[in-house]
């Protein structure tokens, strides 16, 4: 069975969860309308086998600063903990 895994990340688990492999991370805030709409798009991946990390930008300002996040939602792609790409804004499922 194929599933999507949405993992809430924070200061305590970020490094452990993202240090190995290819990881897609969304930085969001609860007050951002685009972020709420983005969550609906992410939940549309239930028919694929994909791991997506979620970071609340208000709760983890040090991670926002570390990765140079200037707006929400922002996606970063990590390979073995190193940022290899960054995408800012709302994306439909087909664009991700």
Please identify what each model-predicted range represents:
Residues 18-30:
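Short active-site neighborhood of thiol/selenol oxidoreductases, capturing the structured segment around
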């Amino acid at each position: 069975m194929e599933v999507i895994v949405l993992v809430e990340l924070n200061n305590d688990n970020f490094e452990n969860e993202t240090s190995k492999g290819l990881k897609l991370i969304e930085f969001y805030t609860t007050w951002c309308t685009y972020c709420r709409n983005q969550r609906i798009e992410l939940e549309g991946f239930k028919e694929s086998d994909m791991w997506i990390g979620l970071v609340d930008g208000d709760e983890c300002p040090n991670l926002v600063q570390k990765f140079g996040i200037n707006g929400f939602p922002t996606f970063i792609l990590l390979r073995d903990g190193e940022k290899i790409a960054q995408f800012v804004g709302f994306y439909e499922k087909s664009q991700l």
